[in-house]
Amino acid sequence: MSITLESLSACLKNALGDALVQTIERLGELTLVVKPQAYAPAMLALRDHPDCRFEQLIDLCGVDYSGYGEGAWEGPRFAVVAHLLSVSKNARVRVRVFCPDDDLPAVASVVDIWPAASWFEREAFDLYGIVFEGHPDLRRILTDYGFIGHPFRKDFPLSGNVEMRYDPTQQRVIYQPVSIEPRDNVPRVVRDESYGDGRA
């Protein structure tokens, strides 16, 4: 049996109490913004509270809000977004928590609540540098162990910092500074006024 968005929102507000900062209903979906210090208890309540029962963590990712809305964003830079599914109630919810420190973004791990979060949290750590406190094995998962930086951050250089190549003289893979020159891709301006109207 499916639950309406309004009744789901009321149940979640009751279950989360002061941990809830904001609820957003948009495009038929419900987003909950929770306090960073109450993130893990709120997620546990979403799983175990009888009005919620979100048994499955579908996805968890990091977000870099710098430059969001054409630079109009004034809130914290990094957030963690989780999508939860309640099979028993046929309901979905999105949970967003903002990292309080932009220099060292960190939130609690939810691996103890949903073991499936392990690799999602490792991915967010690898790509955004978000630290998940209490994670049993927080290390890179997609980039090389010697990789410098976090490639999904908006201030990461487009061409990267170093490049890998095989050196036949050393017979091994080596790292070297990026040799690609940065360039601006400016669209070509067509000055012919009849361009594109079918005339030759």
Curated annotation (Swiss-Prot):
Quaternary organization: NDH-1 is composed of 14 different subunits. Subunits NuoB, C, D, E, F, and G constitute the peripheral sector of the complex.
Keywords: Cell inner membrane, Cell membrane, Membrane, NAD, Quinone, Translocase, Transport, Ubiquinone
Record-listed E.C. numbers: 7.1.1.-
Classification via NCBIfam families: NuoC_fam, PRK06074.1-1
Catalytic activity annotation: a quinone + NADH + 5 H(+)(in) = a quinol + NAD(+) + 4 H(+)(out)
The UniProt record lists the keyword Membrane: yes
UniProt name for this protein: NADH-quinone oxidoreductase subunit C
A cellular component term, taken from the record's GO annotations: plasma membrane
EC primary class: translocase
InterPro entries: NADH_DH_suC (IPR010218), NADH_quin_OxRdtase_su_C/D-like (IPR037232), NADH_UbQ_OxRdtase_30kDa_su (IPR001268), NADH_UbQ_OxRdtase_CS (IPR020396)
Main location: membrane
MF terms (GO), sorted A to Z: NADH dehydrogenase (ubiquinone) activity; NADH:ubiquinone reductase (non-electrogenic) activity; quinone binding
Family of the protein in this entry: Belongs to the complex I 30 kDa subunit family.
Function description: NDH-1 shuttles electrons from NADH, via FMN and iron-sulfur (Fe-S) centers, to quinones in the respiratory chain. The immediate electron acceptor for the enzyme in this species is believed to be ubiquinone. Couples the redox reaction to proton translocation (for every two electrons transferred, four hydrogen ions are translocated across the cytoplasmic membrane), and thus conserves the redox energy in a proton gradient.
Name of the gene: nuoC
Localisation: Cell inner membrane
Protein's membrane topology: Peripheral membrane protein
